[in-house]
Amino acid sequence: MTYRWILPMALLLCFSTTALSVNYDLLRSQLRSSNSACLMLLRQLNGAPQRCPEDTMNFQVPEEIEQAQQFQKEDAALVIYEMLQHTWRIFRRNFASTGWNETIVKNLLVEVHLQMDRLETNLEEIMEEESSTWGNTTILRLKKYYGRISQYLKAKKYSHCAWTVVQAEMLRNLAFLNGLTDYLQN
């Protein structure tokens, strides 16, 4: 009697697992589109690093991010999420001294948050399936990197020049994010 339910249950489990699995190609496409929007918004902010030559800074991007070569798609998703989260936090800080258009900054924050929302759903599934120790060291290095950016802004009292330097760094970050999205493939 119980045998006749085993096959339908097995098929149901198989199909539901397939239906629930992460569609990395769709995610990659969505993230690339949103990254392009963020890039456009960041470029609309009026900052020119040439005007602040004394305020240059090397924030020391983690090497595995700058020269990403061996990422598993699950690790890439986790790293992308972490980068977006810190980017979002940075742009929520005091940027009043910049003269930036608040609407542009708000739109940038919306785009970044939208990417985070898209990733959160997938990350929940990824985290259930595996635990990555590789990602932990990279995440720690990323936190230190973004900490240096935050400390720089604070030390410079959120000056226009400091924000201009950070804006240029965030433009670099978007290039790194685009490179990382290449690892999100089915």
Swiss-Prot record:
Belongs to the alpha/beta interferon family. One of its GO terms (biological process) is natural killer cell activation involved in immune response. This is Interferon beta. Type I interferon cytokine that plays a key role in the innate immune response to infection, developing tumors and other inflammatory stimuli. Signals via binding to high-affinity (IFNAR2) and low-affinity (IFNAR1) heterodimeric receptor, activating the canonical Jak-STAT signaling pathway resulting in transcriptional activation or repression of interferon-regulated genes that encode the effectors of the interferon response, such as antiviral proteins, regulators of cell proliferation and differentiation, and immunoregulatory proteins. The keyword Thylakoid does not apply. Disulfide bonds join C52-C161. It is found in: Secreted. Keywords: Antiviral defense, Cytokine, Disulfide bond, Glycoprotein, Phosphoprotein, Secreted, Signal. The modification Phosphotyrosine is found at Y24. It comes from Equus caballus (Horse). Monomer. It holds the Pfam family Interferon. Residues 1-21 form the signal peptide.
